[in-house]
Amino acid sequence: MSELRINKTLNTPEIVFDPDQGILSIEGRSIPENPNDFYTPLFKWMDTYFDESPQEKTRINIKLEYINSGSSKFLLQFLRYIKQKYDEGNECIVNWYYEEDDEAVQELGEHYRSSVKLPFNMIDYID
């Protein structure tokens, strides 16, 4: 399985998934006009990964500077999907990065953490 790379734009985050390392990174702004069209390939890619060659541990690193409501709904769906894979025996961990003074992104991460109930680290940083 090859690497998935979706380049960042003004409205969409960079998505990099390295199946050999089991690391998915989502970074940037997430305000696409149609979140379903943007994120559906990621679901398909992750399905193939978990069906064919999951690593011992899968890490999901999320570092968003801004996210709109449509993307937020998708992301919750995606994290529920990861929770399902976790419940099926795949070791998964989410690392949610937020700027030290960005309460909105921090609170969103805390909401996701309490909603999906899987290993979920809240990591603050200074930009």
Where does each model-flagged region fall?
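Short, aliphatic-rich beta-strand segments
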Residues: 22-28
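A cross-taxonomic marker for long C-terminal extensions/tails that follow the last structured domain
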Residues: 110-127
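A short, well-ordered alpha-helical element
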Residues: 12-15, 33-56
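A generic structural motif
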Residues: 30-32, 66
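N-terminal amphipathic/basic leader segments beginning at the initiator methionine
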Residues: 1-17
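Amphipathic alpha-helical interaction surfaces in cytosolic regulatory modules
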Residues: 37, 42, 62-112
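A general structural motif
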Residues: 21, 55-59, 89-93
